[in-house]
């Protein structure tokens, strides 16, 4: 995906013009210095050329966006059907309402992927792009918070365990996720027909807030869960957060949070990159981290399916069946 652009080559006219201007200033200010090496002058002129990076997610990456979106929608829809299917064993999964919300978040992300994909025309409005980024990050923030609650509360999230707990968490988590998306919604728009984040001095506060939100949700939250798990185990204070296969979700977003933080430091000139190669490496990491984050909408339904399969196979013999399930099983037993 993408076409790599190497260091810009100066045209003969540009090179001659630059050389003439440089020599005029040098001669008038310091006099002619015949000992100035030609090689050093060429190296300095080459170093002053613009630094171009390889954009992996350009127009040629459109098939990747479309395929990921289609697969994500199909996989999320299948998981939602299984979770809401009457008298299906996946409804016995601990905290299945939270799992259903994870599938909804993954489906929302999958739907909005084509909106932000390059190569789908040049008439997209800033409002559509802002809405796309709002759903993009809002669904991701909500999924991360849902995973944190599912790991911390575990079996107490089951239907009927704590009255009103699931509803309260649902409203709170999606409300917080919506608030966290306000900075990126206001700092995004359309430029040259592409949806992009707008970097400017006026929007620097919004960009900083968005970066902090990504670092907190995608980087610090999983680190906090791992830390709490290890600390409680070391101190003998109980099992700690419930570790399961769903934690693999953070693998897809953790690099995005880290690289986004580095990019903000570079743009704010708090971290200086001395070479063009370092800037190209950072741009490449940004593209790779974004591509990995996009793939989560396909991986999340698979993780949910694997978790529900493992949980029901392990917990089904020890879980009390709801009344509807008991009568259904009794009917099946009498028929046999």
Curated annotation (Swiss-Prot):
Membrane topology field: Multi-pass membrane protein
Consequence of changing residue 28 to A: Does not affect interaction with Plasmodium vivax Duffy receptor (PVDR)
Disulfide partners: 51-276, 129-195
Mutagenesis or variant effect for residue 18 to A: Does not affect interaction with Plasmodium vivax Duffy receptor (PVDR)
Post-translational modification: Sulfation at Tyr-41 facilitates interaction with MGSA/CXCL1, RANTES/CCL5 and MCP-1/CCL2 but not IL8/CXCL8. Sulfation at Tyr-30 facilitates interaction with IL8/CXCL8.
Tissue expression: Found in adult kidney, adult spleen, bone marrow and fetal liver. In particular, it is expressed along postcapillary venules throughout the body, except in the adult liver. Erythroid cells and postcapillary venule endothelium are the principle tissues expressing duffy. Fy(-A-B) individuals do not express duffy in the bone marrow, however they do, in postcapillary venule endothelium.
Entry's Gene Ontology molecular function annotations: C-C chemokine binding; G protein-coupled receptor activity; signaling receptor activity; transmembrane signaling receptor activity
Effect caused by changing residue 15 to A: Does not affect interaction with Plasmodium vivax Duffy receptor (PVDR)
Glycosylation sites: 16, 33
Impact reported for residue 9 to A: Does not affect interaction with Plasmodium vivax Duffy receptor (PVDR)
Extracellular side: 1-63, 117-129, 188-207, 266-287
Domain of life the protein comes from: Eukaryota
Protein name: Atypical chemokine receptor 1
Residues in compartment: Cytoplasmic: 85-95, 154-166, 229-244, 309-336
GO cellular component entries: early endosome; plasma membrane; recycling endosome
Lineage per the UniProt record: Eukaryota, Metazoa, Chordata, Craniata, Vertebrata
Family of the protein in this entry: Belongs to the G-protein coupled receptor 1 family. Atypical chemokine receptor subfamily.
Subcellular location field: Early endosome; Recycling endosome; Membrane
Record's keyword terms, sorted: Blood group antigen, Disulfide bond, Endosome, G-protein coupled receptor, Glycoprotein, Membrane, Receptor, Sulfation, Transducer, Transmembrane, Transmembrane helix
Organism of origin: Homo sapiens
Keyword Flavoprotein part of the UniProt annotation: no
Region of interest (Mediates Plasmodium vivax Duffy receptor (PVDR) binding), residue spans: 1-30
Additional facts recorded: A subset of erythroblasts from genotypically Duffy-negative individuals transiently expresses ACKR1 during terminal erythroid differentiation and P.vivax merozoites can invade these ACKR1-expressing Duffy-negative erythroblasts.
Membrane-traversing stretches: 64-84, 96-116, 130-153, 167-187, 208-228, 245-265, 288-308
Entry-annotated residues carrying Sulfotyrosine: 30, 41
